UniProtKB/Swiss-Prot annotation:
This is Zinc-type alcohol dehydrogenase-like protein C16A3.02c. GO terms for molecular function: oxidoreductase activity, acting on the CH-OH group of donors, NAD or NADP as acceptor. The lineage of its organism: Eukaryota, Fungi, Dikarya, Ascomycota, Taphrinomycotina. One of its GO terms (cellular component) is cytoplasm. InterPro entries: ADH-like_N, GroES-like_sf, NAD(P)-bd_dom_sf, PKS_ER, YIM1/Zinc_Alcohol_DH_Fams. PANTHER family: ALCOHOL DEHYDROGENASE RELATED, RETICULON-4-INTERACTING PROTEIN 1, MITOCHONDRIAL.
Length: 347
């Protein structure tokens, strides 16, 4: 590193991958990376010292997708991760909302993560519309967990479903990162919530506000949902085609499915297109199926955190790992047994 580019903030460390594969096979830690000086920031950039990050299934699915897809989506080597919480170090010349030392949380935009890298690092340069203030009393670990999981739940329930008091809702995969936020948000929005999870997670779902808790290991889900329904919406967090095909038995005629999850493969894309486009006479369902692609904006960040503070909604944290143990954090996430969020602390 030349003296002309030496940063006043020192250097950063980051986890990177330069080929596709499982995290344990492709992730490596690199130290001594350059941190931009204030003069090097774009006008709307915010430089954040990351205190905690959380990881999501999207992170390892992108890492483990086809090489040709990876090259089309992002620049290699790439830093994985989208969610973060930390302290502002410097801002661009046009940034008015933030200043140095402020506590913030955010979600790196997909295009920026592809070009410049994500949040599995000690420092991140993000856009001023992709970050918001972290309220007093909220820990960095909790704030890091808001990100994709909390905002996806908010997008589906508030912006897409537009739920209101009395809305009847099924949440499948209710004990994961998105699911736990969805249950808590739906409860605060006065919905009637039926959750689907494993036996060991029934109590967690109940504690978050579920009206009814179903066990996918023991219950006949279609029969139980038919008894408890009909429902306005189903929020599918696990990519379950079986429930969708049986939806006429428990979803109202004008109801709909909203889905996330699934691998980034051609077969997955085909199954999603089938659910979205295939008519009932060809084996599909009469209900609409909406695939959720999250687009974060500052209004969403602000509204979400205001709501969770008002209703005392907490991030459910499954586990916390040191930065050096990031590969182990991914291994935990990939068990599909997490109760809430997996957090990585960087300090």
């Amino acid at each position: 590193m030349s003296s002309e580019t030496k940063s006043e903030f020192g250097t950063k460390s980051a986890w990177l991958y330069n080929r596709t594969g499982k995290p344990k096979d492709v992730l490596y830690l690199e130290k001594g990376l350059h941190i931009p000086n204030p003069a090097e920031l774009g006008p709307y950039d915010v430089l954040v010292e990351v205190v905690a990050t959380s990881i999501n299934p999207l992170d390892y699915k992108l890492m483990n997708t086809y090489q040709m897809i990876a090259k089309a989506l992002f620049k290699l080597p790439n830093i994985p991760g989208y969610d973060f919480a930390g302290r502002v170090l410097a801002v661009g010349s046009e940034v008015k909302e933030f200043s140095a030392t402020q506590r913030v949380w955010g979600c790196q935009s997909f295009p920026r993560a592809g070009r410049q890298g994500g949040s599995c690092a000690t420092h991140i340069v993000t856009g001023d519309k992709d970050v918001w203030h972290l309220p007093d009393g909220v820990s960095f670990n909790e704030g890091a967990g808001f990100g994709i999981a909390g905002l996806t739940a908010w997008e589906v329930l508030v912006r897409q479903m537009k739920v209101k008091p009395g809305t009847k809702l099924v949440i499948e995969g209710a004990s994961g990162g998105v699911g736990t936020f969805a249950v808590a948000l739906a409860k605060a929005l006065e919905c009637e919530v039926t959750t689907i999870s494993s036996t060991e997670n029934l109590d967690l779902c109940k504690s978050l506000g579920a009206t009814h808790t179903l066990d996918y290991k023991k219950d006949n889900l279609v029969e139980r949902l038919a008894d408890l329904g009909p429902y306005d919406f189903v929020f599918d967090c696990v990519n379950d085609n079986v429930l969708y095909r049986a939806s006429s038995k428990f979803v109202k005629p004008d109801g709909a499915f909203f889905g996330i999850g699934g691998d980034i493969t051609l077969s997955y894309v085909g199954s999603r297109l089938s659910r979205t486009l295939r008519p009932r006479v060809l084996g599909g369902s009469s209900h609409s199926y909406y695939n959720i692609l999250l687009h974060v904006d500052q209004e969403m960040l602000r509204d979400f955190v205001d709501f969770v503070m008002k209703h005392n909604i907490k991030t459910v944290i499954d586990s916390v790992y040191d930065f050096e143990d990031t590969v182990e954090a991914f291994n935990r996430l990939m068990t599909h047994r997490c109760k809430g969020k997996v957090i990585i602390k960087t300090d």
